[in-house]
Amino acid sequence: MSKSLDISTTEAEQTVTEVIDTIVATTPDVRRAVADYRGQSNSVNPTGDDQLAADLRADELFEQRVLGIDGVASYASEERADVKTTDGRLHVAMDPLDGSSNLEPNSGMGTIFGIYSEQPPTVGTNLLAAGFVIYGPITSMVVARDGSVREYILEDGDKRVVDDDVTVPEDPTVFGFGGGVDSWTDEFESYAEAVRHELKLRYGGAMVADINQVLTYGGIFSYPALESRPEGKLRVQFEGHPMAYILESAGGRSSDGDQSLLEIEPDELHERTPLYLGNDDLIDRLEANID
């Protein structure tokens, strides 16, 4: 059963701040784990993806430290089947190491998180804050909270603001579409063909990096419904909700092809969804094209 937010706004805000600061403080250890735990773990996550040792180590680090915060009642992760609970008030859902398949070629990876007022699985409108970390040439963090989005540079477990008002640029420049082209539906392929002639391809295999391209340059990111997988690939709770919260807070839109991703109330913790995120007009056209 979900635990409701039964605390004052001040207490909730303090806990949200503690969660964000704890994630910031953990990032140096996650970067070390990426270097030290590059091998396979011979296990799979609840949705069948192969897990690297780095996936498990990042999950372990965040679980220990986030659940150590007095105000946190539960921790849910893409890497574990069930929610881990304790006494507290707010609820954290994470993709501890997004894009870990990029580890072998040493490409972009990151961490995605959402802070909820209700225990997952829950609707996206229960988010109080969401964000992601990119472990790139520099470590950066984007956080959506209280209707605005900020970008930080992370150094030695601390953060400094580099942009206190991140907004999606009005003139879109880039696009990135996941899933095998041969598996795209005819409707989505028609839309994608039009977009290819308007925008530049930017797709790196890590959602954090691809979404940051949209935040930086404007455009659209999608992992669509496929003929072979109409339910989509990405997880509502761990990827869809947090990224939708960020994009919508930055003036963009999110959609599952019909409604805002934030309106989805998953029945299962690891439920998947088609996912479309970007500039308003591009999402409007997408919905009209696949309707």
UniProtKB/Swiss-Prot annotation:
Presence of keyword Hydrolase: yes
Enzyme class: hydrolase
Catalysed reactions, as listed in the record: beta-D-fructose 1,6-bisphosphate + H2O = beta-D-fructose 6-phosphate + phosphate
Gene Ontology biological process: fructose 1,6-bisphosphate metabolic process; fructose 6-phosphate metabolic process; fructose metabolic process; gluconeogenesis; sucrose biosynthetic process
Localization, UniProt: Cytoplasm
Binding-site residues for substrate, renumbered to this chain: D98, G99, S100, S101, Y203, K233
An annotated GO cellular component: cytoplasm
Superkingdom assignment: Archaea
Main localization of the protein described in the UniProt heading: cytoplasm
Protein keywords: Carbohydrate metabolism, Cytoplasm, Hydrolase, Magnesium, Metal-binding
Family to which the UniProt record says this protein belongs: Belongs to the FBPase class 1 family.
Stored PANTHER family: FRUCTOSE-1,6-BISPHOSPHATASE-RELATED, SEDOHEPTULOSE-1,7-BISPHOSPHATASE, CHLOROPLASTIC
Protein name: Fructose-1,6-bisphosphatase class 1 1
Organism: Haloarcula marismortui (strain ATCC 43049 / DSM 3752 / JCM 8966 / VKM B-1809) (Halobacterium marismortui)
Lineage summary: Archaea, Methanobacteriati, Methanobacteriota, Stenosarchaea group, Halobacteria
Gene (name only): fbp1
